[in-house]
Swiss-Prot record:
Belongs to the LysR transcriptional regulatory family. This is Small neutral protease regulatory protein. Residues 1-56 form the HTH lysR-type domain. The keyword Cytoplasm does not apply. GO terms for molecular function: DNA binding; DNA-binding transcription factor activity. Residues 16-35 bind DNA. It comes from Streptomyces coelicolor.
Length: 316
């Protein structure tokens, strides 16, 4: 972890000197550490110059994975501390798990308002499989997960599935100056020459994207990276990426639906049997999702565009 944090700090600050100051170590010590890392890998991770350090191609690949590991470790430490603190507090507890979603924050806020006497903790993981395994031995009380269409999750025996949405379309994120960004709906063929960015650590995402691209008869280059790397590359026009339709607006990125909605996921709340919080959790999850759908302009328009779409989310 120390090596990964050092690499991330150098990339974030743009120089070994500033990274050393941020990490609280001497510049020579950090320089030596970087050299040892590069020697162990057999290649340089950064270009050094008068203007600072820039990641090499290999460096960008390593950093895309390193950030995920560092962020996951930070979440793990925070959750472990919260768990340790909670063990010393009496009263009801609710251990919530979730894959990455724009609605999790609002969902937790609503849950805490609904159950003010309950100590609610959150575990976030990119892998739905990990969360489902935590539910099976009752390490989690419930988990909100998504299942990529065509890549069914292996739900452990005994768990109860509550479907929030049978088919949520996945939209595409583009740079504002991308030619397809001017259209209300984007065809896959319009993205055949773009680099596609996917997160291989998300269960089923790469397989789902690969199937859809193959069915469309296109074979664009594919990059693997985490959310932060994806967002920066999309904003710079270096890639396009599938995204949740509830994604909020950004000045440096536009969100558009794909024609005929070829990419989709199923949204599930999974609980052990006889979970007393299942009903309230599902109701507040539905409310949080509907609120997010209303805030996301392209998704709201998509929901209003055809009668067979889940208009109940909009109160219809």
């Amino acid at each position: 972890m120390r090596h990964l944090r050092a690499l991330c700090a150098i990339a974030d600050t743009g120089s070994v000197r500033r990274a050393a100051r941020e990490l609280g170590v001497s510049q020579p010590a950090l320089t030596t550490q970087l050299r040892r890392i590069e020697q162990s890998l057999g290649a340089e991770l950064f270009h050094r110059g008068r203007d600072g350090c820039r990641p090499t191609l290999l460096g960008r690949t390593v950093l895309s994975r390193a950030r995920t590991v560092v962020d996951s470790m930070a979440v793990l430490v925070e959750e472990a501390r919260a768990e340790a603190a909670a063990l010393g507090r009496p009263g009801p507890r609710l251990r919530v798990g979730s894959t990455a979603s724009r609605i999790v924050g609002d969902w937790l806020r609503r849950l805490r308002g609904r159950m003010p006497e309950t100590d609610i903790t959150l575990q976030v993981d990119v892998s739905a499989t990990v969360l489902l395994r935590c539910c099976a031995p009752a390490a989690l009380d419930l988990a909100f997960v998504h299942e990529v269409e065509g890549s069914p999750l292996r739900v452990p025996d005994g768990l109860v599935q509550h479907t929030l949405l049978e088919r949520e379309p996945q939209f595409i994120s583009l740079a504002p100056d991308h030619p397809a960004a001017a259209r209300p709906v984007v065809d896959l063929a319009d993205l055949a020459q773009d680099r596609w960015m996917v997160d291989p650590s998300v269960d089923g995402e790469w397989d789902g994207v690969r199937r859809v691209l193959a069915a469309a008869g296109i074979d664009p280059p594919v990059l693997h990276g985490d959310y932060l790397t994806t967002a920066s590359l999309v904003a710079l026009g270096e890639a396009v990426a599938p995204c949740q339709p509830t994604s909020g607006p950004r000045d440096d990125m536009v969100i558009r639906p794909l024609r005929d909605d070829p990419l989709a996921v199923r949204l599930l709340l999974v609980t052990p049997p006889r979970c007393p919080a299942a009903g309230p959790a599902y109701e507040e999850l539905t409310a949080a999702y509907a609120a997010a759908a209303l805030r996301a302009g392209p998704y709201r328009e998509w929901l209003e565009g055809a009668p067979e779409r889940p208009g109940a989310l909009l109160g219809g």
